[in-house]
């Protein structure tokens, strides 16, 4: 008889409070991303408090908007179960909502502090995509965000570790570990952004982040069974991915042709807005 090593979504309990792996992993991704960004921001010459403010407030409002975004597209359920709306520890946050909330918050702080949002975006972009890659393991622990049914033999032929295969056995069926596909794509994106950043112009790394992440998300989303749907045929995440790819490409072209942005490695802190460099 096959024995499955099933992981409990609850890491430990503190009295009446159940602490889930989901929250621990999300927090770990944010912290690791912060330390990586901290090393980058030192090289440019920004004050450390600036980075703390941007990451802290962007994370806070990012989570809030991510939850609101998710609830809006699942409104028929939450109108019947309003008490569950704040229960983010059960899962149910949408990364695209988080990106919207985080980006808007970051831009506001950059404006207030008179610093260049594209330069800060270049600093934070590798940390963001790494954090997203780590965060997908929170979905794994919650046994969510998976693909359609698949046989165990197919998963074994993909040389996926047994502990992952075992935990893809949900309600009597094995499922595609789409969390893993997206996580690996994001981690590869982190490596690429780190290696290329010093050779790119200010703003390019952030734009490449939008493009790289969105390409991967578009294809992975097509395999998922729990997608937020705009209509019966249109997945919200795929539509948002297309929009972000276009935004990334357009901004990169405009900043290269119209503004001739300086190279990332050649400048110190830039003010808002980015000065033209011929």
Swiss-Prot record:
Compartments it resides in: Cell membrane
Keyword Transmembrane: yes
A biological process from GO: lipoprotein biosynthetic process
Pathway annotation: Protein modification; lipoprotein biosynthesis (diacylglyceryl transfer)
Topology in membrane: Multi-pass membrane protein
EC number of the protein: 2.5.1.145
Annotated a 1,2-diacyl-sn-glycero-3-phospho-(1'-sn-glycerol) binding sites: 136
Transmembrane segments: 21-41, 54-74, 88-108, 176-196, 234-254
Keyword Signal part of the UniProt annotation: no
Main location: membrane
Function field: Catalyzes the transfer of the diacylglyceryl group from phosphatidylglycerol to the sulfhydryl group of the N-terminal cysteine of a prolipoprotein, the first step in the formation of mature lipoproteins.
Alphabetized PANTHER family for the sequence: PHOSPHATIDYLGLYCEROL--PROLIPOPROTEIN DIACYLGLYCERYL TRANSFERASE, PROLIPOPROTEIN DIACYLGLYCERYL TRANSFERASE
Protein name (database record): Phosphatidylglycerol--prolipoprotein diacylglyceryl transferase
Gene responsible for this protein: lgt
């Amino acid at each position: 008889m096959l024995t499955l090593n099933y992981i409990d979504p609850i890491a430990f309990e503190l009295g009446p409070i159940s602490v889930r792996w989901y929250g621990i992993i999300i927090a770990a991704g944010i912290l690791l991303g912060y330390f990586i960004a901290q090393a980058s921001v030192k090289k440019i010459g920004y004050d450390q408090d600036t980075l703390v403010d941007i990451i802290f407030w962007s994370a806070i409002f990012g989570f809030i908007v991510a939850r609101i975004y998710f609830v809006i597209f699942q409104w028929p359920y939450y109108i019947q179960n309003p008490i569950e709306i704040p229960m983010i520890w059960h899962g149910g946050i949408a990364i695209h909502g988080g990106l919207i909330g985080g980006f808007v918050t970051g831009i506001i702080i950059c404006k207030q502090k008179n610093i260049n949002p594209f330069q800060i975006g270049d600093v934070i972009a590798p940390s963001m995509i790494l954090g997203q890659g780590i965060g997908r393991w929170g979905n794994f622990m919650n046994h969510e965000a998976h693909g359609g049914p698949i046989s165990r033999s197919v998963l074994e032929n993909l040389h996926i570790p047994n502990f992952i295969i075992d935990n893809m056995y949900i309600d009597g069926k094995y499922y595609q570990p789409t969390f893993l596909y997206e996580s690996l794509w994001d981690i590869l994106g982190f490596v690429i952004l780190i290696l290329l950043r010093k050779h790119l112009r200010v703003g390019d790394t952030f734009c490449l982040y939008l493009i790289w992440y969105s390409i991967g998300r578009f294809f992975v989303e097509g395999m998922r069974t729990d997608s937020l749907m705009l209509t019966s045929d249109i997945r919200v995440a795929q539509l948002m991915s297309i929009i972000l790819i276009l935004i990334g490409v357009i901004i990169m072209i405009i900043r290269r042709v119209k503004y001739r942005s300086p190279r990332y490695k050649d400048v110190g802190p830039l003010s808002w807005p980015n000065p033209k460099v011929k």
